[in-house]
Amino acid sequence: MKIAVYGKGGIGKSTTSCNISVALARRGQKVLQIGCDPKHDSTFTLTGFLIPTIIDTLQSKDYHYEDIWPEDVIHKGYGGVDCVEAGGPPAGAGCGGYVVGETVKLLKELNAFYEYDIILFDVLGDVVCGGFAAPLNYADYCVIITDNGFDALFAANRITASIREKARTHPLRLAGLVGNRTSKRDLIHKYVEACPMPVIEVLPIIEDIRVSRVKGKTLFEMVGSEPSLNYVCKYYLDIADQILSQPEGIVPKEIPDRELFSLLSDLYLNPIGGGGQKKKNQENLLGFTRI
């Protein structure tokens, strides 16, 4: 099974992806996580350092695939999760989609691409041009990371458009949304009412999730010294269980941008309950912006 994880930049995709990967490994799966971001920090939480990228390795070998061994590009992370970083072209030049294609090509040359039960693509930001939508060409499912905020749901809506487009020629389905570090769900619920799709899980605001990223550790690793965090891991195990159930998934139909703006802004501009509630909702909006 191949899964592509998308979402607004800074929403916590890499942290979420790493914890999902470990959760899947805990369920007995052989997992490979592929970071698809020029920052090449997707797997930092699994390995504790920035591993060499596929592109760096190819360049050092003058693109002679026959001179590259699996251990040159596949690094072992926490919990037995294997890690690969695609890397990216120089800033302002080249195409990220080409890099993803070269990564998959090399893994196939190494007979590694089909050796895993789960391959998880962690894709940069909310860029859904043809280049960075490339992982969708290989994925069975897409998971969108969001929060209860305006911008994150706008990004999610654009990603659904890419899923719909790719699903025309490829058996791709949206598994659902994962809400990350959010105390409320009103905007998420309003969005999925208008654009029907599953909500896999919603994680509350837990500071240790952010701290784990800084420490370069997954929540599962942190539990070793902080057993009180075990309850957080259960969220990721629940996500893993839902993925492993091979959900039917959907091909979503995005909402037109102006319609979505009107839909979400209406909750704040015309709340039920009058001015006091309006002020409270506006304060909540500012709160989500700070997050």
From Swiss-Prot:
It is an enzyme of class 1 (oxidoreductase). ATP binds at G10, I11, G12, K13, S14, T15, K39, N180, R181. GO terms for molecular function: 4 iron, 4 sulfur cluster binding; ATP binding; metal ion binding; oxidoreductase activity, acting on iron-sulfur proteins as donors; oxidoreductase activity, acting on the CH-CH group of donors, iron-sulfur protein as acceptor. PROSITE patterns: NIFH_FRXC_1, NIFH_FRXC_2, NIFH_FRXC_3. Coiled coil: none annotated. One of its GO terms (biological process) is photosynthesis, dark reaction. Mg(2+) binds at S14. Pathway: Porphyrin-containing compound metabolism; chlorophyll biosynthesis (light-independent). [4Fe-4S] cluster binds at C95, C129. It catalyses: chlorophyllide a + oxidized 2[4Fe-4S]-[ferredoxin] + 2 ADP + 2 phosphate = protochlorophyllide a + reduced 2[4Fe-4S]-[ferredoxin] + 2 ATP + 2 H2O. Homodimer. Protochlorophyllide reductase is composed of three subunits; ChlL, ChlN and ChlB. Belongs to the NifH/BchL/ChlL family. This is Light-independent protochlorophyllide reductase iron-sulfur ATP-binding protein. It comes from Larix decidua.
